[in-house]
Amino acid sequence: MSADKFRDSTHYRDWIFTEEDLSKTRAKVNEKFTNIVRERMLEELSLQNKEASLEVLPPTLTVEEELELVNYYSFQLNALSSALSLPTHIRSTAILFFKRFYLINSVMEYSPKIISFTSLFLATKCNDHYISIEQFCKNMPKTTPEEVLEYEFNVCQSLKWDLYVWLPFRPLQGFLLDCQTVLPKVAVEKFYECHDLSKKFLIETLHSDIYFLHSPSIIALGAIYHTNPTICLQYIEAKKIPELQPLIISISANLKATKKFKIEKKKAQDYGRKLYFCMNPLRNKSSALYLKRKAEEESTNNNKWAKKFSTSSNVLDKNPFE
């Protein structure tokens, strides 16, 4: 993959950050939706004729708790994709769709469980891997086609309609093919083994923030270094790019730490219970606020149709030939 080509992509422009910018982005999203959710909860309490004050509201999720839930559902999404025997590029695309969505939105606004399913179904369509929505939902516990499709537009919009994801698997293959040329003394079997282990390692670390910080090519080299440091260092020396060595070693260490990191199910369940009480009531179709907004929307639409019909009737009442 050409570095110049990647730097011209929307992936690089919109989805590569510094660590500081990534943290700030998540903090801003959390603050924004915390305020929105609190306002909606106050409206809901008022409609129920209950005390509506900030003191009685349940606590909202912190930035860290939101990130823990996003990472937990990233794990679940990876496991689900594996159970469905979906190709590597589809599961990778789905996880990155999912994580990108929550750089723009909050789990307090959109259910991470539903968005994970929506992201996966969208990834199958973007990669020409046809599955009917009915067949797809047969594999999803207690999920309907309507739920999966309801937020598909929101996901696409949040992704800025950038539905092509640059992944490290193609650069991985390219580097190891190049290695066979520049390192002729190394047995070919070593490269095959390195490829398979590196690919497996990358799949196991798809939930890492590394994908928001570095290009797929550098991530691929980090995976090669993790799997076979000797081959990676010899390749760097042969290509005369020693300045990349510290970065590659750092990425490899980061990915290794990510692989070991797993969220305890109990902790995720605790955050899930907290989330249940601080979800935006406007997303709950049985809430007083949702029913009120729906009635207002229907009334507005009915008035528009009535006005349009009235105008049409007046036109038809006139004889165009007089």
From Swiss-Prot:
Its main location: nucleus. One of its GO terms (biological process) is cell division. One of its GO terms (molecular function) is cyclin-dependent protein serine/threonine kinase activator activity. The keyword Coiled coil does not apply. SUPFAM superfamilies: Cyclin-like. One of its GO terms (cellular component) is nucleus. Keywords: Cell cycle, Cell division, Cyclin, Nucleus, Phosphoprotein. It is found in: Nucleus. The modification Phosphoserine is found at S310. It holds the Pfam family Cyclin_C_2. PANTHER family: CYCLIN (PTHR10026). Essential for progression through the cell cycle. Possesses kinase activity that can be detected when myelin basic protein (MBP) is provided as an exogenous substrate. NCBIfam families: ccl1. One of the nine subunits forming the core-TFIIH basal transcription factor. Interacts with crk1 and skp1. Belongs to the cyclin family. Cyclin C subfamily. This is Cyclin mcs2. It comes from Schizosaccharomyces pombe (strain 972 / ATCC 24843) (Fission yeast).
